[in-house]
Regions:
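Feature primarily recognizes SF3-like P-loop helicase cores of small DNA viruses
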Residues: 1-239
């Protein structure tokens, strides 16, 4: 089905070629595995209901396909806290609406041409960058371009340059917070840090848990995301 997010789950309709939709989620929304997903949220976010609601709105806003908050979402916490599991499960459920970017692309130490990577962002809703090295400094010009409503200038290899209006939200999950210049107000304004304080070990640590979540609760995860979108839209895109 195709979903009109302004109507939430009631906005389901049959696929229509005239919609010109070229991407698809990996699952359809349903309630199967909802208990598994809710238990996972409580575990990862330490039963913090307000934080869970906030993160649901962040993810829900991301999938709308228009930039309403010009921000880099930083999921921060020491290892074994579920942050990679959470974001990888979200990304896999979103299928071709999600993509990845090398974390070093965001840093001043990156010397390669990043325009081919930027070209892959066109039409995506959620972009994940994973794990910065300790002490890395953010490249302010790259952050401002990727976390903005302004056109992104990119090019694929051996192709002519082009520009596009961003539709994505960029998430960086990392054990180490990046460095930012103290006087760089523009970059500070674009940073939203989501804390991950859980310590998941022993019986609570399931290997390849993101795959397990998608296999056993993928539809419930997508439904949770759609509900987040609906809440954000009703509240006027205010976080």
């Amino acid at each position: 089905c195709t979903l009109n997010l302004t109507e939430g789950l009631s906005g389901m309709q049959e696929h229509n070629p005239e919609d010109y939709i070229t991407k698809v989620t990996a699952v359809s929304p349903d309630d199967i595995g909802a208990d598994i997903w809710n238990d996972t949220l409580n575990l990862i976010f330490c039963d913090d209901r307000e934080l869970i609601k906030y993160v649901q709105r962040i993810v829900g806003m991301a999938v709308i396909g228009k930039v309403y908050i010009e921000a880099l979402i930083i999921a921060y916490g020491e290892g074994r806290n579920g942050k990679s599991t959470f974001w990888n499960a979200i990304a896999r459920v979103l299928g071709s609406y999600a993509g990845n970017m090398s974390a070093d692309t965001l840093t001043v130490g990156c010397k390669r041409n990043v325009k081919p990577e930027m070209a892959e962002l066109k039409g995506k809703r959620l972009i994940i960058a994973a794990e910065l090295e300790e002490g890395m400094r953010l490249n302010t010009s790259v952050i401002k371009q990727l976390c903005s409503t302004d056109a992104v200038y990119a090019e694929k290899k051996y192709k002519a340059p082009f520009s596009f209006i961003p539709s994505h939200t960029l998430v960086l999950y990392t054990n180490h917070l990046p460095k930012v210049g103290a006087s760089d107000a523009g970059t500070w304004r674009r940073l939203i840090v989501i804390p991950f304080h859980a310590r998941i070990e022993g019986d609570s640590d399931i290997k390849n848990f993101a795959d397990y979540l998608v296999d056993h609760a993928g539809g419930a995860i997508l439904k949770w995301i759609i509900e987040g979108s609906r809440k954000v839209i009703i509240e006027g895109f205010n976080m």
